[in-house]
Swiss-Prot record:
Gene: Acox3
Listed name of the protein: Peroxisomal acyl-coenzyme A oxidase 3
Cross-referenced Pfam families: ACOX, ACOX_C_alpha1, Acyl-CoA_dh_M
InterPro entries the record matches: ACO (IPR034171), ACOX_C_alpha1 (IPR055060), Acyl-CoA_Oxase/DH_mid-dom (IPR006091), Acyl-CoA_Oxase/DH_mid-dom_sf (IPR046373), Acyl-CoA_oxidase (IPR012258), Acyl-CoA_oxidase_C (IPR002655), AcylCo_DH-like_C (IPR036250), AcylCoA_DH/oxidase_NM_dom_sf (IPR009100)
Annotated positions of the Phosphoserine modification: 10
Amino acid sequence: MGSLPEEKDSALWSDTPKGPLSAYRARASFNSGELLLFWDGQDVIHFKKTIFSTLENDPLFARSYGADLPLEKLRELNFLRCKRVFEYGFFKVEELLKNPLKILVLINCLGMYDWSLANKCVLHMLVFGTTVFVSGSEKHFKYLEKIYSLEIFGCFALTELSHGSNTKAMRTTAHYDPDTQEFILHSPDFEAAKFWVGNLGKTATHAVVFAQLYMPDGQCHGLHSFLVQIRDTKTLLPMTGVMVGDIGKKLGQNGLDNGFAMFNKVRIPRQNLLDRTGNITSEGTYNSPFKDVRQRLGASLGSLSSGRISIISMSVVNLKLAVSIAIRFSATRCQFGPTDKEEIPVLEYPLQQWRILPYLAAAYALDHFSKTIFMDLIEVQSARLRGDHSDQQAELGREIHALASAGKPLASWTAQRGIQECREACGGHGYLAMNRFGDLRNDNDPNCTYEGDNNVLLQQTSNYLLSLLEPPLQDGAHFTSPLKTVDFLEAYPGILGQKFLGSSKADWMDSAAPLAAYRWLVCYLLQESHRRYCQEKKSRGSDFEARNNSQVYGCRPLALAFMELTVMQRFHEHIHSSGLSPSLRTVLGRLSTLYGLWCLSQHMALLYRGGYISGEQTGRAMEDAILTLCEQLKDDAVALVDVIAPSDFVLNSPIAKADGELYKNLWAAVLQQNGVLERAAWWPEFSANKSVADRLKSQL
């Protein structure tokens, strides 16, 4: 049943090749084409297919196994590919605005191919370009065509060598000179150098630079963004007063040139201030639509939320690639069996199912969340461009900030653990570089720290939740938020009094069960975090110390549990939308329940300690439910992967091609490597001077 539907839309899909995976596809309980249409929609499916086929048919994007280019050549090739992507017109603004979700789809498709390429394009067009558009005003729009045509190439320079997460402590300065109507941009010392900036190492000609804005009277108005030319657009030589360079090789994504920059009293026109959050008039007066400094800083750094939301999606892509490889491998790799003459696919083993199928469920749940939070962000940005600074929009922005700040840690950590588990689940073949797990692991790794260290970001979410726990809320007063993610807290006291009354496996087999448990868990952790904070504040008297000492067993798990609940709630609602066929609702419902129980099982100690569940049988029943769901999803796993996996060319893993010819494809890939059958170029060293034992002993 896993084959594609025979209808007019079937041209959107490629025929699934016949081979060893066909048996699993035939056992699927649903139609994979129907699920693909529900999951992505016809417009997005067509867009994806166009991107994948375009890359595959262009020799510039050809890849060979085992070819490691020198760093300089890798950077050159990545820039050439970036140019080609723009030449194909994938970043046409008018097309992307018709369906903003295509922005996310484009990033993800390029990232499935290579994150160095995706991030180079994204940092230029969607981070640098969008910041100029959203944070600037009409006088800055002249740069947009130059950005799109690559006449200028941009980057986003916020982080400094000595400061990252603490944005308010950035030390680059911009002093206003009223006599010349210029800003003087300056780095007071090397610790204030802009650092880790993507595209800045070799290619950026312009940067959005964040600096502390000082007026002639010495008053500092805080962090503002400025458009600064870094290099000459013809020669790529640094501009006067700018010291710029490359920070060097990284653990991954080395096609992207991360760099540093220092400014020695560099003068830029007053008009180069991106002035939507604050401006200086020609008369030299500073004004801002935001009276609150924190609100202004939040608006100035609004692009950070978009960056974090992009990273959620990037992490999900990496997880989808990893589970696609692991499940296809597991369905075709046969080892052992009930008799010596019979071997069965390792996917048939409950242990293998338990190791990788929860990550498949997580990929689906997080994928849906990443799409919905992205569209929420689009709504906020659209309202800001319309000049809507209402309290409702401010609260929406605050809620999205809280979701992005916990969503990035949850997604990136889930992907990082999932990639490693999938690597190990593929045994020795998973360690072979050509099968891609190493690149996935290294490319996903920075998602855990850039655009905000995960553990620091979680504090943003817990602070948001703790701010809601005021006396009116505890008294049961009405409470709501724009996205309704915290509306359940209106029943906060009542939820804390609830207990799980079931004791059998069947009681856990519906996604409503983990949802109810998570609502209780969030309320319990909110109460515990608030209690810890108040105790620490009373004993130490410092808000700073009280917050720090409330993190480990309070605020950190609170933020993660809240995020897991939000992801599960949105997935649950999506599955129960109208018009979904029974077969799709069943398989997606199993994924939803598995994701919820798998996440919830990591909080068992808290569920018992807080009294939500009791007795040995309840915990065992949850474990039995997880194993049963894995068994139920086993026959659907290959078809579920067919929905989220890219083309073979983009997936680029010999052990995970859609035809399932595991050994033929792996053997062919090994033999296609350059020099695989040649003797070592250094063979004379092996043959000459063989008697080396003890030769240098006298010199010791």
